[in-house]
């Protein structure tokens, strides 16, 4: 079936104007995730912020109670004992100057990046490469740290970084279509709670304005925010 026809069929039964309770929305999304691969379940949260203003930036990290269903490759910039600690914790790529050179050369063999504080002057050279990919280590989200073991295990165990985009939207994958409905609900509530707690001082009016969930190839289903936050 062509993608257009499949999406049209998947949209049947979804009222695009209605706000559904979270459990109902998840059920509908799962029922419409009919691709041959295990689709990612995604959430989009529209926030009442303007990220062009520094006091309205929203970002953070949260460990989902049921993981993401995705295997992340973790890269760590560290030397000596901290490099050994990273390897022992399960990091996929560990290095210092050598790793910086590889990244500068266009070879990025990781999905999440962690660094010890002493490495940041070196890692800072990679801003133009890692920044646009949302991979630049940042102490605010725990990816610049001396606690390498917990940072690596957190990244491997289902932690999700979130950051508001220019349009005021936070988007994240919160599991797979193969997950049980209850597990997806728990993950969404954990993420939304973290986003809520990250509300910036400069935010005015209604903070969480609209929420929608979808699968990789399926239609978006709007969610009643109160059914998540309540």
Swiss-Prot record:
HAMAP family: Ribosomal_uL1_B (MF_01318_B). It comes from the Bacteria. PROSITE patterns: RIBOSOMAL_L1. InterPro entries: Ribosom_uL1_bac-type, Ribosomal_uL1, Ribosomal_uL1-like, Ribosomal_uL1/biogenesis, Ribosomal_uL1_3-a/b-sand, Ribosomal_uL1_CS. GO terms for cellular component: cytosolic large ribosomal subunit. Part of the 50S ribosomal subunit. Belongs to the universal ribosomal protein uL1 family. This is Large ribosomal subunit protein uL1. It comes from Rhodopseudomonas palustris (strain BisB18). GO terms for molecular function: rRNA binding; structural constituent of ribosome; tRNA binding. The gene is rplA.
């Amino acid at each position: 079936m062509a993608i257009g026809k499949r999406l049209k069929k998947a949209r049947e039964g979804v009222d695009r104007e209605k706000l559904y309770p979270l459990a109902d929305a998840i059920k509908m999304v799962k029922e419409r995730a009919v691709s041959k691969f295990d689709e990612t379940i995604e959430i989009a949260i529209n926030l009442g912020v303007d990220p062009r203003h520094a006091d309205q930036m929203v970002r953070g990290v949260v460990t989902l109670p049921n993981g993401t269903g995705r295997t992340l490759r973790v890269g760590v910039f560290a030397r000596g004992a901290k490099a050994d600690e990273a390897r022992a914790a399960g990091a996929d790529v560990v290095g210092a100057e050598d790793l910086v050179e590889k990244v500068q050369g266009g070879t990025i063999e990781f999905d999440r990046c962690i660094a010890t504080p002493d490495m940041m002057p070196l890692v800072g050279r990679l801003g133009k490469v890692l920044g646009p990919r949302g991979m630049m280590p940042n102490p605010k989200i725990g990816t610049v740290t001396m606690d390498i073991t917990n940072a690596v295990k957190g990244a491997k165990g289902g932690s999700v970084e979130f950051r508001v985009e220019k349009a005021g939207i936070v988007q994240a994958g919160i599991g797979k279509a193969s997950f049980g409905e209850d597990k997806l609900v728990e993950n969404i509530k954990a993420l939304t709670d973290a986003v809520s707690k990250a509300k910036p001082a400069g935010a005015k009016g209604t903070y969480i304005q609209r929420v929608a969930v979808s699968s990789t190839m399926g239609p978006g289903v709007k969610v009643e925010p109160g059914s998540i936050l309540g």
